[in-house]
Amino acid sequence: MTNIISIQSTVLNDLVGNQAARYVLGSKKYNFYEIPTIILTSHKAHKNSIQLNSKNLNPLVVYNYLKKTYPLQSNDLTIIGYTPNLITAKAIQKIIRKQKKILLDPVMGDVGIGLYINTEVANFFKTIVCEASYISANFFEWSYLNDKNTTNYTLDDLCKDLKIFAEITIGFSGRCYFTENCSKFLES
C-alpha cells in the first residue's frame, strides 16, 4: 500500500489542509500520515478561529517520530501545504531534502487579496518550487512564484512557464527559472 505524508494545516472543523487530503486520499486506501504545520479550530477566514500549540509545533520532530514508528520511505509522496512562518518553513525544508516525491501546494494568496502569508514564507516557496515534483498552485500563487504580475500574465507566457517547470521536474539541468536564489534556503 502506498504511503502519503501530508505536511500542512490541520483545521479541526473545516475541510482544508490535512483534513481535505485525508478525506480524498483516505478513501483510496493509502496509508496517510499527517504532520500539522499549524492546528486551528476552524479556517482562518472565520473570525473566531483559535490556533493551538503554535510554539512547540515542529513538523521535523513529528516527521522523525513518524519515520521511527511507521515504514516511511524517501520515495513516498509528500504533500507540502500551508506554512505559517519561516521557522516552520525551515523545518519543512529539511524534510524536503529527505523525500524525493514532493507535491507543493503553496498556500499563499489569491487574486484580489494578494499574499495572506508573510513575504519571507512566500519567498521560501519560490526556493523550494525547484525541489517539487508536482505543483498545485492557483493563478495568483503561480504568478508570484514566477515573479509575474497577474494583470498582464498572458496565457502564452503561462504556458511557457508551465513547460519550463515540467522540464525542470523531469531532470532539466539548466538554472532554476523561478528565482536566481533557488539555493538560498537550501544552504541555510
Language-model segment annotations:
Residues M1-G109:
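Conserved N-terminal subdomain of the carbohydrate kinase-like
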Residues Q93-K94, I117-K126, T150-D156, C182-S188:
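Charged helix-capping and loop-helix junction motifs
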